[in-house]
Structure formats: C-alpha cells, structure tokens
Amino acid sequence: MELSETYACVPSTERGRGILISGNSKSDTILYTNGRSVVTLDLNNPLKVSIYGEHAYPATVARYSPNGEWIASGDVSGTVRIWGAYNDHVLKNEFKVLAGRIDDLQWSADGMRIVASGDGKGKSLVRAFMWDSGSNVGEFDGHSRRVLSCAIKPTRPFRIVTCGEDFLVNFYEGPPFKFKLSSREHSNFVNCVRFAPDGSKFITVSSDKKGIIYDGKTCEILGELSSDDGHKGSIYAVSWSPDGKQVLTVSADKSAKIWDISDNGSGSLNTTLNCPGSSGGVDDMLVGCLWQNDHIVTVSLGGTISIFSASDLDKSPFQFSGHMKNVSSLAVLKGNADYILSGSYDGLICKWMLGRGFCGKLQRTQNSQIKCFAAHEEEIVTSGYDNKISRISYKDDQCTNEESIDIGNQPKDLSLAPLSPDLLLVTFESGVVFLRDGKVVSTINLGFIVTALAVTPDGTEAVIGGQDGKLHLYSINGDSLTEEAVLERHRGAISVIRYSPDLSMFASADLNREAVVWDRVSREMKLKNMLYHSARINCLAWSPNSTMVATGSLDTCVIVYEVDKPASSRMTIKGAHLGGVYGLGFADDSHVVSSGEDACIRVWSFTPQ
C-alpha cells in the first residue's frame, strides 16, 4: 500500500500570539508546526507535503539550514532536534537547549551556529550553540521575561538580536556573544525581529502597533514604519522581501501590509493586502507571514493560508485551509465518491476533493464540538458533548439549516438510515433514542451499557454493541426494538459496528484490538482472528464492493483485510497517523482515506492481492 495524497493540517495558532513560519527559497517550500508534527509544504503544490513526527512534545518552530540540507526544530520542552530535510529525515543531533518552550530559532549564515529563544522557566531565556557539538557560544543576559523572537545577522561581523515580553530589544556582539546594549522603544510585547538579507538593517514589530528599523551593525535606531497608514492592532510577524527593500507585516487588524524601506531606514506604506476571510470574526486575524521568492504567504488565526504573488498583487490569492485538531470523523459521500467530509472535535467540518485537496469549510451557525458524525448526500448529523444532536443541511459550502435537538443524555454513537431519511437512532449510556423528523419519538432503556450502533439503510434492523463485548441484534418496528439475537465473541467493549454496502455482512471491532466480520443471515463469523493491532480499534470501513474491511487503531496503523481470505493475508499501513487513526473510509475499491490525531487526512492506494 502506498500514500497517494496528504491533505495537511494547518499551523497551530493561539489567540494573542504570532507564529513564526519559515521556508527554503531554493525548493520553494515552507515549514510550520502543528502538535508534534513539523510540516514541509510546497508552495507551488500544497498536496506535496512531508511530515516529520519524531518530537516527543508539541513542536513550536522549525528552520532550514542555509544550505537547505538540514532542519532544526524546537518544541515546548526546550529540545532542539536537527534532522535531514529530505528522504528519511535522519536525525543528526538532539540538544536540550532551554528549560521551557522554544519560541524562535535561527541558523547563522555559515550554518555552524544556532540561536534559540523562548521561556527559560527561571533559567536562561536565550542560548546560542554549535550545531554539531551543542557547546555554548556566548552569554545572553538582559531579559527578564519570555523571549519571543531572535535573529542572527546574515553577514559578518555576526550579531544577535532578541526581543520579547519585557518590551526590550537586546543586541549582542560576538562570537562568543555578549551583551552590548538594550533598546526600550516599544511599549508592549515585541513579537518578532528580522534582519534584512544583506544584514544592513533589522526590524522589530510589537503589540504596540509599531515597527522600528535599526542599523544592523550598531543597533542605532534609523526610523519607523509610518503610523499614518499603520496597523490598528498588534503586529505579530514581519518578513523582508528578497531584495531587502520592502517588508511584509501582519496584524490582529486582519490586514497584511507591504512597506517600502528607504536607505535611511524610514518605512512608508506601499500596499495593504486584504486576505478575504471566511468567518468575519477573530479567526481572520493574521498571525504569521513569509515573503519567499515571488510568494507572499499569510496565515490567519483560523489556519487559512493565503499565497499572493509579489509580482501581481492585484491577483486574488490562492487560499486553502484544513484542520488544526484531531480529525475524529470522516465520511466519503456515496453519491459523489470524489468528495470527503471530515470533522474535527473543535467543531470544524471540511470538504475535500480527491486529487484537488481542500474545497472549503462548512460555515456552521453553531460551532459546537464534534464527537461523532454521519453524513448522507446533503445532510450531516453530529453529536458533541452537550447532550445535543445537530442536523445540518448543506448545499455547496453553506449550511442552509442547522437545528439542535436535546436528547437529555450524553450521545455515544449515532446512525442514519439513508433510505428512510427521517429516522435517526442515537445511543446513550444505557439505551437508545429514536428521532423522526428532528423530534425525539421514543427513548428505550436496554438494560446494559451501550457503546456502539449501526442501522441498516432501510431502517429495519440495528446492531447495538455493549461494554461487555456482546452484540445485540434488533429488528425495528415503528419506534420500538425487538431483540432477535445476541452474538458473543469480543473480549472488550465494542467500539464500532458497520454494515457492508451489499448488506450481507456486518463488521464489529472492540477496545481489545480485535475485529470480526459476521454473516448477517446465518449470524456466524465470516472472518475471525483479525487481531493484528496492538491497541484499541477506533474506526472501521467497508469497500464499496463489500470484499474488504479496513480498521484503524490507536497504534497508528490501518489494516485492510479481504473477507474471502484468511486474516493473516492482510495489508498494513504502519504509522498512518501520529497519535492514532480516528476516521476511515473507502473512496473506491483501491483507495482508502484515513484521518487521525495529527489533524491530517491521507489517501492510500493499493491493489487487492
């Protein structure tokens, strides 16, 4: 089985803080982080993605070495890992640099030194070290609070500038680096500092809405970005143009601005770029930016990445987005197998198209969390953690109608009957709720702890799984259930049940890592010994032709079984998703779509043996 497409997660963002993305001008790729993943994304083809997931803690920042061969990435534990940018991402070194989170790091132009800054938790807040040995190259005094950004002058004589939450901009000479002077021109957090490509100047931007330009060799103040047309909110990030004559800034006022920087260091506004936002709310605040070759990249708080062309700023930007949190549910739309709907637990539903990637976010009227969902043609049903079921009708990317129904209990699982679209069954801790046309018509207590559910498309039969590992088969008559049989095989609580598309079988899986395929008529096991996961099974899917079953697990693997062959002749994808697989679906008989804890969606192609 091989990976055919990855729809990448978007950068992790935080309200009130900027993110510092970086790139490699030779390969036209950018680097950003989400959770424990470091994502390398091609600006010319966002489907060309590589993900590094070896950090033990959430990664915060990543930078290419000057020659583009190595990447240094830092995480919240203060560790910096240096690894190969290509092929197998071989680890070169790992150093414990700070006692707390790393917020920024930079390579020196000769690729020999790295400076990192962040939160020292009472110890040093900045450290510069040799990239191969980790030995210190200087003392960095002068800061009293978290250091949000650092920069190394790209030309000799080397200089290091740092800035942070104590409103200070500190200047160090070296190597070995030592404190030279401090500037107190800003009156709020200083969020980002960057040197011009020729090293003659550097600029700092701050939450006081100011940008100040300094001499790169002496740290003397040269000028400011003009306040007449300035930002009306905190400035979170700044990036120089490749020729060093302009800078790009992004702000909480939802705009990006390009400034002309004169030789004497004053900045006048050239253009204001308005990134067309989707929400109109705080999610449109811009928190990160990068100017690389002809690409001007901005990132919003909601994770939307906009790519402008620097040579044609009037052209509307190419925009795409995705998930920031665990993608816990996934549905391949049967009527149109090219479309995939995915839901993450923060309440975001995205639409994807095979071969094209991101197609839009569904604009919901209520952004409640999503625990599980079911989709059918133009309707989605979701359940969260607030005892409510939401029925969402959508057309294109717009939700035309969203209604919430309080069922009085915490929903565990839900199932639609597509051929009887007014019927919806929802399980809770001790029973099942019938909903018809958006109203609760009956609540049935089943007398055991319920964990999973599946209903036939015509709404005449249901399988309900229990905490005790038993499968209860019921026939549905009107709004009541009649128990027909109890199947015993599982040794753990049932986690998921699915009927095959031809309705001749159903498959069940449990928290004790076993899956079973059952014949629906004889109620005998059709495929057993599906015991190849090493942790609980979270999700399960059938191929459209009903010959294959795929299972996804907390152990990060996806396993595809052919029903007519022994379980041992399985196909396995190891490490499909960092942190575990939570959503699965078949696009067709040779493509499996998976989603997981890493907020990514992947399409795998295979040939049945």
UniProtKB/Swiss-Prot annotation:
The function of this protein is:
Binds actin. Enhances the F-actin depolymerization activity of actin-depolymerizing factor (ADF) proteins.
Which cysteines are cross-linked by disulfides?
Answer: none
- Top-rank taxon of the source lineage equals Eukaryota
> PANTHER family from the entry?
WD REPEAT-CONTAINING PROTEIN 1, WD-REPEATCONTAINING PROTEIN WDR1
Q: What is this protein called?
A: Actin-interacting protein 1-2
Q: Which Pfam families match?
A: WD40
Q: Repeats (WD): which ranges?
A: 2-42, 54-93, 97-141, 142-182, 185-224, 230-269, 277-318, 322-362, 445-484, 489-528, 532-571, 576-609
Q: Which PROSITE patterns match?
A: WD_REPEATS_1, WD_REPEATS_2, WD_REPEATS_REGION
**What keywords would UniProt list here?**
Actin-binding, Repeat, WD repeat
